[in-house]
């Protein structure tokens, strides 16, 4: 019954809600829009069911199995249910045991944050307690120190300067980590007399991270320069509205990009898988799980639905499996599951009016995804990503070529089939970008080829303009090279935006990165200003002129110059020259970041105080010299302790005044401070701490001012990214090693290419054999290709598809001449593989992909079928191959079809015999003689005494039909002669066609 239908996700996962102390979860109906709720008078953010504790999985692609995470909080995973262990066991302490203030503070922190591993700063180390410490010790290969009195206080620790490196290693195990820092200085407490001298140091949670949200935030105090940022996957929220209806919102924390979509899928979830393959998420949050009917169930019905055995349960369970497993196949780290949310936050506290109005225009299921992501990201201080609506776009497949997941995998566009890296892929061939933001834009271009002829021509003209060896092009290339791969302007700008939410985040942004960002923006604007006359006088392509005009308009403001005047370029340029060395202390960078001649009175005041204390210390040294009658005496520094008076042991020590305080010493010397020197040194430390705070406050104000110009900086970055991509395509098009030509675009559906070459294979091996492609809509739109195994059939059809993609990206293609029409989709069924994770056999996978192709057909589709029907018996396989091919031939949509087969009998059915002229299916159009047969060329070589001939592959396409020569290929593979002879005898008396 529909009312008792089990929700998709809940069949496999149970998610327990952990309630925070003193807070009740606000319960609202999911049907109420979070954006309408935002206009209510109650501005507080209500508590909702948390996504944790949740099970986290790791997927091993080589074995297609699910492994339980090493997180000690998670129990073993059963087949149909995941029980999540309580994350912190309550340990009963003996009543006689008295807790120290630090232990009480640690217990309080652990109880307030039970869903995280806490790294707690204690002095100059970070400590992890309890069972979490055992997990971290294994992860970092450090010592685990067990407590004899209470397991809660067992711990492991590491130095504070290792925080960034160790944090990354812990996050890679798929857990959520919180960083707790000391929020006050002991010296400030002492001098300002804040509290008692023995009071506990204040500690606060300053950052929460997962692998998908960590952006090198904690490297600032690690004593190293900014490392290269690992490219993060998207954080994706999917709302499963009904069995085949989905809404999706994805955010990229590193760039601020937001993508949304709502779509209808089928039983194979091909649409969902295509989006996930493009997004490559690092974290997924699942909502909904089962459709509107589940909303009408009361709690009892929902809880008991898994026990129902009414009709359709097995089918539903199969579909539910594929929904969840679609994520488990593509997400290597965290899959977070929630049932239908019962409460939605009031987003008015997070989003501004413009953002709220924008999101109200979206469909309600998309709004729910936005609301849940805002709630989820609040803990990571990333929720204000949704305030920049300029970064929001729709995953719109109607404006670009459709490349389903199966197509991208078969053509190896982004990852190869051997080891899932980019080596040997189309993207690796095209990627000559010089900047990270340019590379990301090129990924978007490759995955979304254009279908508008005018826009493709515009891109070709821009590539042609940038292909000349002009002075302008050389300077532009050097500018992008100067920015380089290690400076991600887009990422730095969005980090500045995040920092405006929480003050503590401002201290996690590298000042050198800020300076280099401004310097590169200044260089870019100076570059276009320098060539302004050239740009305006040149007859540039519309696209290139539009991009350069945008940059010229931005260059006419003094925004970047004003910010550069506020900082100290002489110091920072010296730092930049030592960019790959740990040159100067973080504190020195803070103090010398600003140009103190332009204001900053509080910083100048503290610097003056420090200078005054230093003068007093020198005066005190003069007094000590007179006292000890040592005119050559100077301060020494030992073990990090400065301003020490060093005296040889013996009578000299005994004669010192009684108020001299011994700091350290050796067997021969002792080191002291007088009472006044100790006091002055303490005052110096105090003013240095205050100076540090004043610098942070000034920097935070500076970042807020920068963020107010986020759109301005983003405009520069986006235009530079377009130039970077165009230069990358120009580099491919101007390849010196091989001929590349600009194809002529045709309104007709035609593929006419002379001496075409496979763009990837020609770079991997020598002696590549070029082939002509001559496919015309009205004469031979269906090619049935036979020929020997390993003869190059698959490579040929892949070459056709790749050349079309390159054409519609705007890149020259490897051939001598080409005329190509515009395609709106490339649909491929290729390869023989099962999918154990989804419970599909090889043949089931094959048929589902064929079904998807038929559903997505358009009059401008290119369809590639590789050996349809080989996953089942010969008779059924042959019959299905014939029926599917006939459907594609007779369909009124009339796509171009390339069909590889070893069923040579298909040719007699499709070519020599006319189809039934009386076919009554209104979707079929019979009678067109458009099916042509081809085979991959070869030569037979017969040696005396051989039972069957050997073959030599020629790799050229020839008209006609050919056998498969499987026995010859088996011989090449090294099968024993006895086996080959037996196979030959069997084949001579058996005809499987």
Curated annotation (Swiss-Prot):
The lineage of its organism: Eukaryota, Fungi, Dikarya, Ascomycota, Saccharomycotina. One of its GO terms (cellular component) is nucleus. PROSITE patterns: DNA_MISMATCH_REPAIR_2. The keyword Iron does not apply. SMART domains: MUTSac (SM00534), MUTSd (SM00533). Heterodimer consisting of MSH2-MSH3 (MutS beta). Forms a ternary complex with MutL alpha (MLH1-PMS1). Residues 1-50, 290-317 are annotated as: Disordered. Component of the post-replicative DNA mismatch repair system (MMR). Heterodimerizes with MSH2 to form MutS beta, which binds to DNA mismatches thereby initiating DNA repair. MSH3 provides substrate-binding and substrate specificity to the complex. When bound, the MutS beta heterodimer bends the DNA helix and shields approximately 20 base pairs. Acts mainly to repair insertion-deletion loops (IDLs) from 2 to 13 nucleotides in size, but can also repair base-base and single insertion-deletion mismatches that occur during replication. PANTHER family: DNA MISMATCH REPAIR PROTEIN MSH3 (PTHR11361:SF122), DNA MISMATCH REPAIR PROTEIN MUTS FAMILY MEMBER (PTHR11361). ATP binds at residues 787-794. GO terms for biological process: mismatch repair; mitotic recombination. InterPro entries: DNA_mismatch_repair_MutS-lik_N, DNA_mismatch_repair_MutS/MSH, DNA_mismatch_repair_MutS_C, DNA_mismatch_repair_MutS_core, DNA_mismatch_repair_MutS_N, DNA_mismatch_repair_MutS_sf, DNA_mmatch_repair_MutS_con_dom, MutS. This is DNA mismatch repair protein MSH3. Its main location: nucleus. One of its GO terms (molecular function) is ATP-dependent DNA damage sensor activity. The keyword DNA damage applies. Belongs to the DNA mismatch repair MutS family. MSH3 subfamily. Residues 1-19, 30-50 have a biased composition (Polar residues).
């Amino acid at each position: 019954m529909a009312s008792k239908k089990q929700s998709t996700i809940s069949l496999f996962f149970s998610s327990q809600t952990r309630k925070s102390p003193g807070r009740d979860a606000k319960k609202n109906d999911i049907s109420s829009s979070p954006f309408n709720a935002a206009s209510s008078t109650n501005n507080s953010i209500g508590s909702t069911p948390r996504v944790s504790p949740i099970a986290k999985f790791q997927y091993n692609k080589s074995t297609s199995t699910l492994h339980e995470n090493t997180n000690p909080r998670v129990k073993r995973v059963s087949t149909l249910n995941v029980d999540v262990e309580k994350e912190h066991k309550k340990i009963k302490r003996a009543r006689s045991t008295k807790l120290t203030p630090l232990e009480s503070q640690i217990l309080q922190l652990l109880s307030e944050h039970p869903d995280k591993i806490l790294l707690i700063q204690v002095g100059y180390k970070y400590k992890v307690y309890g069972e979490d410490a055992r997990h971290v010790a294994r992860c970092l290969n450090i010592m685990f120190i067990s407590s004899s009195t209470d397991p809660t206080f067992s711990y492991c620790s590491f130095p504070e300067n290792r925080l960034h490196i160790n944090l990354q290693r812990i996050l890679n195990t798929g857990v959520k980590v919180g960083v707790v820092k000391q929020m006050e200085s002991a010296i400030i407490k002492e001098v300002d007399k804040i509290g008692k001298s023995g009071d506990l140091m204040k500690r606060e949670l300053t950052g929460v991270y997962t692998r998908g949200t960590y952006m090198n935030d904690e490297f600032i105090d690690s004593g190293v320069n900014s490392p290269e940022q690992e490219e993060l996957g998207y954080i994706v929220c999917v709302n499963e509205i009904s069995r085949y209806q989905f809404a999706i919102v994805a955010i990229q924390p590193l760039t601020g990009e937001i993508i949304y979509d709502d779509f209808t899928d089928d039983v194979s979830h091909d649409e969902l898988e295509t989006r996930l393959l493009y997004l490559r998420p690092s974290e997924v949050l699942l909502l909904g799980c089962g459709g509107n009917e589940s909303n009408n169930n009361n709690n009892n019905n929902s809880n008991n639905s898994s026990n129902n055995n009414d009709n359709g349960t097995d089918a539903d369970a199969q579909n539910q499996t594929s929904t969840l497993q679609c994520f488990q196949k593509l997400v290597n780290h965290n899959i977070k599951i929630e049932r239908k949310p019962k409460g939605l936050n009031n987003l008015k506290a997070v989003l501004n009016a413009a953002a709220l109005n924008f999101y109200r225009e979206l469909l309600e299921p998309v709004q729910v995804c936005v609301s849940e992501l805002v709630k989820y990201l609040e803990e990571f201080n990333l929720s204000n990503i949704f305030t920049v609506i300029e970064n929001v776009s729709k995953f719109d497949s109607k404006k670009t070529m459709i490349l389903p997941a199966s197509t991208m995998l078969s053509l190896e566009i982004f990852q190869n089939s051997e080891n899932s890296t980019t080596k040997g892929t189309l993207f690796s061939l095209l990627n000559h970008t010089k900047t990270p933001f340019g590379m990301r834009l090129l990924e978007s271009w490759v995955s979304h080829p254009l279908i508008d002829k005018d826009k493709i021509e515009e891109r070709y003209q821009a590539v042609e303009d940038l292909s000349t060896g002009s002075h302008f092009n050389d300077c532009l290339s050097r500018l992008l090279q100067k920015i380089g791969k290690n400076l991600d302007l887009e990422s730095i700008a969005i980090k500045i935006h995040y920092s405006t939410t929480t003050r503590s985040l401002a201290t996690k942004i590298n000042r050198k990165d800020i300076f280099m960002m401004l310097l590169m923006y200044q260089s870019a604007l100076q570059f276009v200003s320098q060539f302004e006359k050239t740009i305006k006088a040149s007859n540039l392509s519309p696209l290139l002129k539009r991009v350069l005009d945008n940059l010229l308009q931005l260059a006419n403001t003094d925004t970047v110059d004003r910010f550069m005047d506020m900082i100290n370029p002489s110091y920072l340029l010296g730092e930049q020259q030592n960019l790959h060395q740990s040159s100067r202390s973080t504190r020195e960078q803070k103090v010398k970041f600003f140009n103190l001649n332009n204001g900053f009175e509080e910083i100048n005041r503290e610097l003056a105080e420090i200078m005054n204390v230093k003068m007093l210390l020198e005066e005190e040294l003069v007094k000590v010299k007179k006292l000890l009658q040592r005119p050559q005496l100077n301060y020494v520094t030992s073990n990090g302790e400065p301003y020490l008076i060093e005296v040889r042991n013996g009578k000299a020590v005994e004669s010192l005044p009684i108020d001299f305080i011994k700091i350290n010493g050796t067997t021969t010397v002792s080191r002291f401070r007088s009472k006044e020197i100790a006091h002055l040194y303490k005052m110096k430390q105090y003013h240095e701490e205050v100076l540090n705070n004043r610098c942070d406050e000034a920097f935070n104000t500076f970042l807020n001012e920068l963020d107010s110009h986020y759109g301005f900086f983003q405009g520069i970055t986006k235009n530079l990214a377009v130039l970077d991509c165009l230069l990358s395509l120009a580099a491919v098009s101007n390849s010196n090693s091989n001929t590349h030509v600009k194809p002529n675009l045709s309104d007709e559906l035609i593929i006419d290419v002379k001496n075409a070459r496979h763009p990837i294979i020609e770079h991997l091996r020598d002696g590549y054999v070029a082939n002509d492609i001559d496919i015309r809509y009205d004469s031979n739109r269906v090619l049935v290709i036979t020929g020997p195994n390993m003869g190059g059939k698959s490579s040929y059809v892949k070459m056709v598809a790749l050349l079309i993609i390159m054409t519609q990206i705007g890149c020259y293609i490897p051939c001598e001449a080409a005329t190509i029409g515009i395609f709106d989709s490339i649909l491929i069924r290729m390869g023989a593989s099962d999918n154990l994770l989804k419970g599909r056999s090889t043949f089931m996978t094959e048929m589902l992909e064929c079904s998807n192709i038929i559903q997505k057909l358009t009059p401008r589709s290119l369809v590639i079928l590789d050996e349809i029907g080989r996953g089942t018996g010969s008779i059924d396989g042959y019959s299905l191959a014939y029926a599917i091919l006939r459907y594609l031939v007779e369909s009124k949509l009339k796509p171009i079809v390339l069909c590889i087969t070893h069923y040579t009998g298909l040719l007699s059915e499709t070519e020599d015999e006319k189809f039934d002229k009386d076919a009554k299916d209104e979707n079929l159009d019979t009678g067109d003689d458009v099916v042509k047969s081809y085979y991959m060329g070869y030569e037979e070589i017969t040696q005396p005494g051989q039972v069957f001939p050997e073959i030599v592959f020629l790799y050229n396409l020839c008209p006609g039909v050919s056998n498969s020569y499987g026995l010859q290929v088996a011989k090449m593979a090294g099968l024993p002669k006895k086996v080959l002879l037996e196979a030959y005898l069997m084949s001579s008396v058996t005809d499987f066609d």
